[in-house]
Amino acid sequence: MTLQTEMEAALEVAALNREMLIILDFGSQYSELIARRIRETQVYSEVLSYRTTADQIRQLSPKGIILSGGPNSVYDDYAPVCDPEIWNLGIPVLGVCYGMQLMVQQLGGQVDRAERGEYGKAALVIDDPTDLLTNVEPGSTMWMSHGDSVKTMPEGFELLAHTDNTPCAAIADHQRKFYGVQFHPEVVHSVHGMALIRNFVYHICDCEPTWTTETFVEEAIREIRARVGDKRVLLALSGGVDSSTLAFLLHRAIGDQLTCMFIDQGFMRKGEPERLMEVFNEKFKIHVEYIQARDRFLQRLEGITDPEEKRKRIGHEFIRVFEEESRRLGPFDYLAQGTLYPDVIESADTNVDPKTGERVAVKIKSHHNVGGLPKDLQFKLVEPLRRLFKDEVRQVGRSLGLPEEIVKRHPFPGPGLAIRILGEVTAEKLNILRDADLIVRQEVNRQGYYDEFWQAFAVLLPVKSVGVMGDKRTYAYPVVLRFVSSEDGMTADWSRAPYDLLETISNRIVNEVKGVNRVVYDITSKPPGTIEWE
């Protein structure tokens, strides 16, 4: 997404007369998290490039501006800077980490290398408990990640808080409503970080909590009807929370003008294709075209062991099937995609190479592998969820009546079980893994742990091990259990699952799944590992 289209998207929101805050992104890994935290206060927020000008910001009429952190130092030759006219807009500004340092430098203060960098948790000593720090307890733990610090505050600024290593941990110009914090209130490690964010949103920016699931659904339905009119829309349905929520939303907006296509490539978990058709076709009367393509996909993977080659072949075959079936079922004017706001942020290329100052483009993942369709099948896009984060999609799904089993569904990779079978994928291995995975899901649910894990699944290894069953030697496959805890999937810890749960799962798998004689538990976090094995 270019800066121009990024602005166009933001102007669409501004045209709705919705209160919003904007985050100017200087390349921080936490910019998206800041936006999510503001949304949690029921106030809309958008992440924009730091290159957004003061005039462009004025067009958006935001209630407040947040300057994100970033990997640079403000005195680097290629350090990203915001338009200095921002300080003359009369809009409250909160600078976070690098954003605070940039504020200080542009307003006449001094930033320099800290005598000692501060990384991790630090206790906040509060010097002025009013305004920004209301309800933030003295000694609160805040998350630090900086090697520079403010040496001299600009004229008009006062000290709000410090830590043992950071003399200026929070500062303010109360008259102009400019605030800066050296720590990251948006991360979960900052104990009272949300209290600070709420103070800025409600008390300093004077926002009202108007960003709700109900208002989004109403606006989205109006937008869909206005855009689509009486034309037909095609949606590739996977059964995940994103495409399912999108299907429910589109069906409520345009009814039978929507056609859902479910391509069963043979790599879903046991019972999922049947359950999907039951939920959509039978229970909710949302028409789904079921495309049975299992043999085609399995043939394409014959003899293939490289994980990237498996992904490519699955993607290419998906496009071929989608092309054939959309021609058969069409014509369609629109293709609905479940693009989410993180995808929009990723494509905005706001990262900066500190050595060259060049923009670092970020490749956006293709959605459902429909990005390579031929030109005569280039549909117009409908992307009603493009302003939502994943947790907001779940809330919308619930409000639309989506079954809880889909709303709370653990993330499942597009290539499905094909990348949870290491090495070549065969019909025999798929059956083994489906049976093992079903036991994992059954026991995790039965014992009440499903919501405790980000993901909990089984992996089939391409080796065999010796075992003994009924006084006889066995030589069969080992299954790996992979349970992880995470907030967003970007990082993850291996879950300390109860031994009783693991024992029950292990006993059931070796006794009930033919071809398996050993179960092991993966205790690798991400990083250095990844959540999926392939």
From Swiss-Prot:
Residues 20-210 form the Glutamine amidotransferase type-1 domain. One of its GO terms (cellular component) is cytosol. SUPFAM superfamilies: Adenine nucleotide alpha hydrolases-like (SSF52402), Class I glutamine amidotransferase-like (SSF52317), GMP synthetase C-terminal dimerisation domain (SSF54810). The keyword Signal does not apply. InterPro entries: Class_I_gatase-like, GATASE, GMP_synth_C, GMP_synth_GATase, GMP_synthase, GMPS_ATP_PPase_dom, Rossmann-like_a/b/a_fold. It is an enzyme of class 6 (ligase). The keyword Ligase applies. This is GMP synthase [glutamine-hydrolyzing]. The gene is guaA.
